[in-house]
Amino acid sequence: MGSSHLLNKGLPLGIRPPIMNGPMHPRPLVALLDGRDCTVEMPILKDVATVAFCDAQSTQEIHEKVLNEAVGALMYHTITLTREDLEKFKALRIIVRIGSGFDNIDIKSAGDLGIAVCNVPAASVEETADSTMCHILNLYRRTTWLHQALREGTRVQSVEQIREVASGAARIRGETLGIIGLGRVGQAVALRAKTFGFNVFFYDPYLSDGIERALGLQRVSTLQDLLFHSDCVTLHCGLNEHNHHLINDFTIKQMRQGAFLVNTARGGLVDEKALAQALKEGRIRGAALDVHESEPFSFTQGPLKDAPNLICTPHAAWYSEQASIEMREEAAREIRRAITGRIPDSLKNCVNKDHLTAATHWASMDPGVVHPELNGGAYRYPQGVVSVAPAGLPAAVEGIVPSAMSLSHAHPAVAHPPHAPSPGQTIKPEADRDHPSDQL
């Protein structure tokens, strides 16, 4: 076997060495890749790991020390990790996505490289479902446009003026809501929608029979049936190579004339060019999007900039202070389980277990022999003078922690394969769940 197929000291591809702990070894380094606040994570990890933040938007902005030595990574949705990116991390054993969606991580390549990928699937179910219902109600009752009219100084007093400014407002009772993907959020939306008087249909080819009876919903067997019967369509499935641009010009033409569309799942599910054209032509009466193909979203550019009857929010449907704290705590606990236990057996929400080619033990930590260490240092790229801030406070200058363990691995240069869109197929099942996971 050539050197290009080795990671370290003769270990085959996919096997990474155990993490050495104890008084003779530095503590493992854990990095928050795309954020700078570690105050929630540090109390959970401070006795077993050194915690640092990178505040990066790409791997080019991550300091070499993190790339060489970090064994654990925490991340949100603002950074993408392809195989090429993953190969830059020489000692990484686990990535935890702070949220449920993980389409910004190449989980198969991570598994090939011996890196476990985990998520936090349940923390923001209520928030996302509530936000979805807010968007649906807004489309039906035209609240945003009525508010905007008053802000612009429009005089609204007579019945004729009200009729003009509220044109398009509709009654909800008896309308049919079509849900694509009946995972945690999809079910929560269904229960809320029934309370408002919606007839609820859903399409989910990977969900076991019987859930529709338990929840009092109507199940359809094809996406075309759902689009044909729905007055409003809402998306709650994950994004994968099979359902990219699930909503496109072809599927939009299968929707009812004048239907509404809501997406709080993943931006790549909707072809925004096709949606913009459908809104301009009136084939879709209105749309509400919390997620977009290109984020951060701006009305000043892109195909949706001139689209009428459109509500957009900045990928915030998942957010509440309570949910944010809960998911960060659970993400830190998952990192702790990885450090103190065995990968992947000790992990609660590993999404690429089937792709991991091998699992190695992490040495158990003995708190009695671990000395207090500075945490919360900044690890962002510009090279230069280094410093670390104690007690989780941001460092005065960005830098590194000295005296950390150095591991060197050689990775094969493999290009990340592009995902080919296949609009006719929707959700792809994942090994760690019984129903489609919902995406944040």
From Swiss-Prot:
Principal location class: nucleus
Names of required cofactors: NAD(+)
Pfam families, sorted: 2-Hacid_dh, 2-Hacid_dh_C
Positions of the catalytic residues: 266, 295, 315 (proton donor)
Transmembrane segments: none
Keywords: NAD, Nucleus, Oxidoreductase
Lineage: Eukaryota, Metazoa, Chordata, Craniata, Vertebrata
Gene Ontology BP terms: negative regulation of DNA-templated transcription; regulation of transcription by RNA polymerase II
EC number assigned by the record: 1.1.1.-
Protein name: C-terminal-binding protein 1
PROSITE patterns per record: D_2_HYDROXYACID_DH_1, D_2_HYDROXYACID_DH_3
Family: Belongs to the D-isomer specific 2-hydroxyacid dehydrogenase family.
Alphabetized CDD domains for the sequence: CtBP_dh (cd05299)
SUPFAM superfamilies reported in the protein's UniProt record: Formate/glycerate dehydrogenase catalytic domain-like, NAD(P)-binding Rossmann-fold domains
GO molecular function, one term: NAD binding
Residues annotated as binding NAD(+): 100, 180-185, 204, 237-243, 264-266, 290, 315-318
Renumbered residue ranges of the record's region Disordered: 409-440
Function comment: Corepressor targeting diverse transcription regulators. Has dehydrogenase activity.
Subcellular location: Nucleus
Site feature Cleavage, where: 375-376, 387-388, 409-410
Compositionally biased intervals (Basic and acidic residues): 429-440
GO cellular component: nucleus
Keyword check for Metal-binding: no
The keyword Nucleus belongs to this UniProt entry's keyword annotation: yes
InterPro entries: CtBP, CTBP_dehydrogenase, D-isomer_2_OHA_DH_cat_dom, D-isomer_DH_CS, D-isomer_DH_CS1, D-isomer_DH_NAD-bd, NAD(P)-bd_dom_sf
